[in-house]
C-alpha cells in the first residue's frame, strides 16, 4: 500500500477522541481513519500515571499493527501522562497529542475567569502546570476537575436531569458574569456542550482543542509528504476494547456515520 493511503490512527480512553477525529474528517475527508477507543479501561483520569502510560503504549502498539501512518493521542489524560515517552520510543511516525486550548481562550480577551474543565490527572500533570506557568500570571484561570463526566458520556448520557444537576453542582461557585471562557480540557466533553449551555449563559464561549489538533495533524502529514492525494471519501474503522456492539453503535452515533 502507498504510504499516503495508509490510515491515520486515533486513540482515546473511550469515545471522547471521536470529537477530535470528527474535526480531522471535516478537514481531510479523503483520509482513511482507524479509531481505537479503550472504553473497557475508561475513565483514565482517575488512574495512576503508570497505569495510563501502560494503556497508552498498548493502544499505540495496536494501532501500529494496523499499519497507520500517524497517530493522534486524542485523550488529554494520556497526552499529559505519556506523550513524551511515546514520541521517544516511536520516532519514525508523527504522533500528535492534545492539550487544553488555553492559548485560544486567552485570545477571547473577555472579563472573568477562564474555567478549565478536565480530569483530575490532566490537572495534576506537569504539562498542565507548564500551561499555568505560561498563562496563569496574566489571566484568572480556574481548574475544575470533573471526574464523573467521562462516565456519563461513556454511557451515552449526553443530556438529561442527572447530567444537568452534576454540571450545576460543578459551576455552583461561579456566577455567569464571573466566567469569561470555558475550556473543555477532555475530548469527551464537547459531546455535552449543549447541556452545558443549559447551565451557563449562551454568550459564554465554550472551546476545545479538537480543531487545533487536527490542523497540527495536517501540518505534520504535509511536512512528511504523507497527505492522501485520493479525491474520494476515505474509510472510517472503529474499534473498541469493550467489545460490545453497543459501544460501536454509540461511537457511530457520536461521529454521525452509518
From Swiss-Prot:
Its EC number is 5.1.1.3. It is an enzyme of class 5 (isomerase). Substrate binds at residues 12-13, 44-45, 76-77, 187-188. Pathway: Cell wall biogenesis; peptidoglycan biosynthesis. PROSITE patterns: ASP_GLU_RACEMASE_1, ASP_GLU_RACEMASE_2. The active site is at 75 (proton donor/acceptor), 186 (proton donor/acceptor). The keyword rRNA-binding does not apply. One of its GO terms (molecular function) is glutamate racemase activity. InterPro entries: Asp/Glu/hydantoin_racemase (IPR015942), Asp/Glu_race (IPR001920), Asp/Glu_racemase_AS_1 (IPR018187), Asp/Glu_racemase_AS_2 (IPR033134), Glu_race (IPR004391). It catalyses: L-glutamate = D-glutamate. Keywords: Cell shape, Cell wall biogenesis/degradation, Isomerase, Peptidoglycan synthesis. Belongs to the aspartate/glutamate racemases family. Provides the (R)-glutamate required for cell wall biosynthesis. This is Glutamate racemase.
